[in-house]
Amino acid sequence: MERGEGRRGDCSVQVRKKRTRRKSDGPDSIAETIKWWKEQNQKLQEENSSRKAPAKGSKKGCMAGKGGPENSNCAYRGVRQRTWGKWVAEIREPNRGRRLWLGSFPTALEAAHAYDEAARAMYGPTARVNFADNSTDANSGCTSAPSLMMSNGPATIPSDEKDELESPPFIVANGPAVLYQPDKKDVLERVVPEVQDVKTEGSNGLKRVCQERKNMEVCESEGIVLHKEVNISYDYFNVHEVVEMIIVELSADQKTEVHEEYQEGDDGFSLFSY
């Protein structure tokens, strides 16, 4: 009986202790722990010794299907989302220490800044942080699920933009870059004078061709007249009569006689032609 009672007493004593988290205030609070690590780092810097850089750690976060809806889209170090939407931050203490709970926050950005503050206090200049000292980018490591759906989904174009895209192309004018849409009236005013110029040029060319053709006809007619004038007919002359006239003239020259008469008391000559 005594042994049984002793065993029952041992079982009642071996009760599982509940794990308690550090409070934000108090002697063993989160703030006191961070302060203590900050003092340790200052001592190391004064001794010209440096602490080993922390490990990169895993960026997996929660297991697949665990955590909040936006947990898989967040890449902040030491930050994860609960199933009910709250964001929490944790950091592991140096020298393979235990994880330090930094608290829960309404946004992932606040949780990331809390992690950076604790990391600089624990690891000093070798700390791996989410933001640099001069960086204030709030969307560098976390993107909400709706925004990702909008970026990955099909792009929707408003009706006004569709009308603009379906409108005729714009014409770029010379000079400064000014885009304008041509009007039908302007196009007609610019095209009609060109058509008229073409018509006038065509009519002038036709007139010039006709005039040249007329000149050629006149020249041909004048040439025909001249040719007719040159080709004179000899029907108006009698060849036999002309020959007889030539013979008569030759015979008259042969019948010319010169008589020299010498008379007493006259020293000259006298010529008589018959």
Curated annotation (Swiss-Prot):
Signal sequence range: none
Inducing factors: By high-salt and drought stresses.
Locations listed in the record: Nucleus
GO CC terms, sorted: nucleus
Comp. bias intervals (Basic and acidic residues): 1-10, 35-50
Entry annotated with the keyword Nucleus: yes
InterPro entries xref list: AP2/ERF_dom, AP2/ERF_dom_sf, DNA-bd_dom_sf
Superkingdom in the source lineage: Eukaryota
Chain intervals for the UniProt region annotation (Disordered): 1-75
Gene Ontology biological process terms, A to Z: positive regulation of DNA-templated transcription; response to stress
A matching Pfam family: AP2
GO molecular function: DNA-binding transcription factor activity; transcription cis-regulatory region binding
Assigned protein family: Belongs to the AP2/ERF transcription factor family. ERF subfamily.
Main function: Transcriptional activator that binds specifically to the DNA sequence 5'-[AG]CCGAC-3' of the cis-acting dehydration-responsive element (DRE). Binding to the C-repeat/DRE element mediates high salinity- and dehydration-inducible transcription.
PANTHER family assigned: DEHYDRATION-RESPONSIVE ELEMENT-BINDING PROTEIN 2C (PTHR31241), DEHYDRATION-RESPONSIVE ELEMENT-BINDING PROTEIN 2D (PTHR31241:SF62)
Name of the protein this chain belongs to: Dehydration-responsive element-binding protein 2A
Organism lineage string: Eukaryota, Viridiplantae, Streptophyta, Embryophyta, Tracheophyta
Gene giving rise to this polypeptide: DREB2A
